[in-house]
């Protein structure tokens, strides 16, 4: 579903972006668990557009997070309270970790729920519905 969404928006998307956790930095104690955002998107004014795993592209991510607007993205088959909680908690953790507030919060899903979509609207979380059919598993855009 992330690939289908990326086809609509393009940009540079990093997957499985770590937040919190005991990685040796002074922000978090050893009692903190590492969490991962499903994806963070940057408009990609600089550099190649595509979907990139954070684990192999951390320097590019760190450069982008300092120069571009970040969108936090959670991807779920169907919108649920867990996804909403993840994007809300992820906002605060991301801001503390990377010293920048996300410009946009997005939940990408195949199915909706009117009540939960209302909650998202009140909290300025975009809900984007995409076709759940699997797209190619690629790290870079098609040529």
Please give the residue ranges for each predicted region.
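Charged, terminal alpha-helix-loop-beta segments
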Residues: 1-143
